[in-house]
């Protein structure tokens, strides 16, 4: 059975986008979409714990981490479930998102439905930095835009 989800990203500034998620059975989740209004370069891209948007993207809480692991890159064994690495924006400020991830899911224990997708100000160092913040957030900086992930047709 195929499941689909969608997330509309919005923030205080010009950054916005739409992200689509598709999962067939227990296979990997295919994440695709477009984010506009970014500065050129890499930006951290994570699923955060909560659906709470009462204080903008800040109230989305930490990265989705049901396994209580340290922050890492999407290909690492040691990573939060919500660690999807970086998206890269060109000179035009547009990032084309194309990710396939086997840890997130659209149902079950690692379901991202009802959680918040966040795009960050800076590059995610994938937990390879030399400070404590690297093992928690990847030093990705402030939250530029976010949106709740919901079930789609």
Curated annotation (Swiss-Prot):
Binds 1 copper ion per subunit. Binds 1 zinc ion per subunit. It is an enzyme of class 1 (oxidoreductase). Coiled coil: none annotated. Pfam families: Sod_Cu. It catalyses: 2 superoxide + 2 H(+) = H2O2 + O2. Its cofactor is Cu cation; Zn(2+). Cu cation binds at residues 46, 48, 63, 120. It comes from the Eukaryota. Palmitoylation helps nuclear targeting and decreases catalytic activity. Succinylation, adjacent to copper catalytic site, probably inhibits activity. Desuccinylation by SIRT5 enhances activity. Its main location: cytoplasm. InterPro entries: SOD-like_Cu/Zn_dom_sf (IPR036423), SOD_Cu/Zn_/chaperone (IPR024134), SOD_Cu/Zn_BS (IPR018152), SOD_Cu_Zn_dom (IPR001424). It is found in: Cytoplasm; Nucleus. Disulfide bonds join 57-146. The keyword Oxidoreductase applies. GO terms for molecular function: copper ion binding; superoxide dismutase activity. A lipid is attached at residue 7 (S-palmitoyl cysteine). GO terms for cellular component: cytosol; mitochondrion; nucleus; peroxisome. Its EC number is 1.15.1.1. Keywords: Acetylation, Antioxidant, Copper, Cytoplasm, Disulfide bond, Lipoprotein, Metal-binding, Nucleus, Oxidoreductase, Palmitate, Phosphoprotein, Zinc. Destroys radicals which are normally produced within the cells and which are toxic to biological systems. Homodimer; non-disulfide-linked. Heterodimer with SOD1. The heterodimer CCS:SOD1 interacts with SLC31A1; this heterotrimer is Cu(1+)-mediated and its maintenance is regulated through SOD1 activation. Belongs to the Cu-Zn superoxide dismutase family. This is Superoxide dismutase [Cu-Zn]. It comes from Canis lupus familiaris. The lineage of its organism: Eukaryota, Metazoa, Chordata, Craniata, Vertebrata.
């Amino acid at each position: 059975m195929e499941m689909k989800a969608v997330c509309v990203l919005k923030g205080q500034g010009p950054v916005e986008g739409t992200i689509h998620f598709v999962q067939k059975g227990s296979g990997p989740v295919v994440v695709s979409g477009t984010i506009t209004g970014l500065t050129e370069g890499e930006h951290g891209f994570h699923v955060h714990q909560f659906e709470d948007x009462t204080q903008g993207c800040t109230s989305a809480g930490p990265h989705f981490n049901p396994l209580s692991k340290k922050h890492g890159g999407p290909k690492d064994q040691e990573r939060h479930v919500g660690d999807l690495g970086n998206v890269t924006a060109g000179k035009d400020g547009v990032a084309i998102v194309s990710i396939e991830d086997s840890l997130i899911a659209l149902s079950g224990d690692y379901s991202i439905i009802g959680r918040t997708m966040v795009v960050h100000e800076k590059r995610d160092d994938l937990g390879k930095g030399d400070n404590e913040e690297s093992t928690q957030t990847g030093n990705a900086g402030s939250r530029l835009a976010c949106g709740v992930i919901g079930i789609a047709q």
